[in-house]
Amino acid sequence: MGDWSALGKLLDKVQAYSTAGGKVWLSVLFIFRILLLGTAVESAWGDEQSAFRCNTQQPGCENVCYDKSFPISHVRFWVLQIIFVSVPTLLYLAHVFYVMRKEEKLNKKEEELKVAQTDGVNVEMHLKQIEIKKFKYGIEEHGKVKMRGGLLRTYIISILFKSIFEVAFLLIQWYIYGFSLSAVYTCKRDPCPHQVDCFLSRPTEKTIFIIFMLVVSLVSLALNIIELFYVFFKGVKDRVKGKSDPYHATSGALSPTKDCGSQKYAYFNGCSSPTAPLSPMSPPGYKPVTGDRNNSSCRNYNKQASEQNWANYSAEQNRMGQAGSTISNSHAQPFDFPDDNQNSKKLAAGHELQPLAIVDQRPSSRASSRASSRPRPDDLEI
């Protein structure tokens, strides 16, 4: 019974990483196969060969007739059936242990990267790659292993092989001695001198156990088929809902996450300005490029705009005929747009911004005085 307990401990670990159908299958395997085989069935077949009698005194005739009637004992046959049926499940358990080992290595590497991140090293991409590997292996946040990818394929293959082994052993059992036992077996083999009759001990009790084990095998086969369809339709459902691959990887690397909340600067006509992220309805050719506001082309653009504003202001005052000297475009001082760092440095140093001089303090020439005193057609008469 020590071998049975070791097998039971291994299969008990499989139950933690199986579906509902897999857990029911394991319960059937434990209760109706291993437990029953280790208690009632083994005791019923305990006197199988010793109680097999033939109506002859020829030495060796009973052994030869028993070997012909039962090439393999029912108990040993069912033990082989349980072992073969359990092997695919144990292989799936080995895959689970492999995934758990990978999880330990990834967690250790993730801790090392986080320690390096605290020292100022940029390891964000490596951490994302570790998350993708965990997702590929089916590792959840709290160490739980979920069936997906290679683990799911291994589970499906194990179900297929379990079903194949169940069908194969049922056919072998039917071919060797059927599903019932008779009380009398006729034998004619050397060294028997003639055809002899051999008698089996407790044939009815053994037939009941054979039928019971047959029903258990059919139930296990039905559970495997139901579980196979369940896993298949669940996988299709997850793909329809788009839950199969939440991470998007391109050429082995993560695609960068788009930050829509941060404000960026984009170049318009060679100058940068704060702008919001592009909307989905932007035309294909509209591609603002993020850049720095301290570009020399931008400063020239701002200077030209300032000079044009002063020229427009002077022309407007000349047109309205307002008193006072006009402001010439050549004497206008353009606004300067220093960057934020320069402003902060100046303010920190205690310097204040000087206001722009918008009135020309030079005396007007005689030509300009005579020109300004001449009446114009658009002047108002008082």
From Swiss-Prot:
Record carries keyword Metal-binding: no
Protein name in UniProt: Gap junction alpha-1 protein
Molecular function in Gene Ontology: gap junction channel activity; tubulin binding
Biased amino acid composition, Polar residues: 317-332
Family: Belongs to the connexin family. Alpha-type (group II) subfamily.
Any one cellular-component term (Gene Ontology): connexin complex
Gene3D superfamilies tied to this protein: Connexin43, Gap junction channel protein cysteine-rich domain
Organism: Macaca fascicularis
Start and end residues of each stretch annotated as Interaction with NOV: 244-382
InterPro entries with a match to the protein in the record: Alpha_helix_dom_sf (IPR035091), Connexin (IPR000500), Connexin43 (IPR002261), Connexin43_C (IPR013124), Connexin_C (IPR034634), Connexin_CCC (IPR019570), Connexin_CS (IPR017990), Connexin_N (IPR013092)
Location of S-nitrosocysteine modifications: C271
Residue ranges of the TM segments: 24-44, 77-97, 156-176, 208-228
